């Protein structure tokens, strides 16, 4: 029993140490409370307030930021625009087919206003459907060679609504890293698993599809409920190049995936008659599950549409959020788009002229930038080109370039700007150069000469 005294001795020492720690902490806490309880004098309060420097609610905006130095254009955004009373050559807008200002389209829009007013008064499913909406859907379906089309009132909402209308949680979507912001928002809303492949890298896409194939073999029961999609752009707005559609269609049949194409930038300008990348690559429309496009670029109207098989498109009338809950497209803009489609059908040479202009313009721009710190990117057929600066402080140098040709040469270009914090992948800063139907050879040469002179000053 000799072990008992030692045991009790240990317990007593532990208790004393704990008691000592409690007393020390209690006294410290008491002193802090007494210190805090002392009232500050008015003078002390004023001194504390004077010493306090609050953090800004938003970061400071640099004085040279474009938002603080806006340029106001008067009148229509045709090839010639008036800014602060002076005339400028416009190579910054997406009016590729020069439909803005066409009297035939304007007259049709005016007639529509006299008949329907300026709005449609509700979403498509709630008294917002007018006969001109149905007419335009039929015309779009016929133009694209599809069974049915569905019309949206806003181009951005078309793409961001169409994707989550089909892809859900548990599905997998294979997406090019270079897709535009509208597609990114649609992917986010779908809650699907997204697998990104390098821009136009078909070997990388094939590896991802093979990996998914192996997952499906390991769990065939789960594989039956997983839907697979490939989402690409016809003409990538961030790169001005085309998707390799034939290879994508090959993967579609090989790996049993559905293919969605955003033709917002290729519709009306790519292909012999402006029907997009399917026409350009001679791919049957039946091989593509759905085509999405905006009416706000080549057709110079507003809104967007999706085309495909009837059972695919019809599903959006109940599941497309932008279709169900947004006010429908104003009738005057629907008839304006209809008239623009009629002109493309009647004058396919309009599309072909823009294509030739883009091809020749690319050669001239490449020659103009040769030997400078600037380079050009874009496929020859694209009426949109990107100019990059190969050096430090890209954004500042590109802004200086745009401002210089604006002030000295009366040439209107635009910097491609992005929401850097929201973009999934960093996009290289660039200047966009747009070609449109009404530009003459002399005007294009004048713009190229101005770009050449400014580019070689850096």
UniProtKB/Swiss-Prot annotation:
Keyword annotations for this protein? Acyltransferase, Lipid metabolism, Pyridoxal phosphate, Sphingolipid metabolism, Transferase
Q: Which domain of life is it from?
A: Eukaryota
- Recorded metabolic or biological pathway in which this protein acts: Lipid metabolism; sphingolipid metabolism
Cofactor(s) for this UniProt protein: pyridoxal 5'-phosphate
Q: What is its EC number?
A: 2.3.1.50
Q: Name one Pfam family in it.
A: Aminotran_1_2
Q: Name one GO cellular component term.
A: membrane
The keyword Transferase appears for this protein: yes
Q: What class of enzyme is it?
A: transferase
Mind listing the GO biological process terms from this record? ceramide biosynthetic process; establishment or maintenance of epithelial cell apical/basal polarity; sphingosine biosynthetic process
Single GO MF annotation: serine C-palmitoyltransferase activity
Q: Which reaction does it catalyse?
A: L-serine + hexadecanoyl-CoA + H(+) = 3-oxosphinganine + CO2 + CoA
Give the quaternary structure: Heterodimer of sptl-1/sptl-2 or sptl-1/sptl-3.
Q: Which PANTHER family match?
A: CLASS II AMINOTRANSFERASE/8-AMINO-7-OXONONANOATE SYNTHASE (PTHR13693), SERINE PALMITOYLTRANSFERASE 1 (PTHR13693:SF2)
> What does the protein in this record do?
Component of the serine palmitoyltransferase (SPT) that catalyzes the first committed step in sphingolipid biosynthesis, which is the condensation of an acyl-CoA species and L-serine. The catalytic core is composed of a heterodimer of sptl-1 and sptl-2 or sptl-1 and sptl-3. Required for the specification of abicobasal polarity and development of the gut lumen.
The similarity annotation says: Belongs to the class-II pyridoxal-phosphate-dependent aminotransferase family.
Put simply, this protein is called: Serine palmitoyltransferase 1
- Organism equals Caenorhabditis elegans
Q: Could you tell me the gene encoding this protein?
A: sptl-1
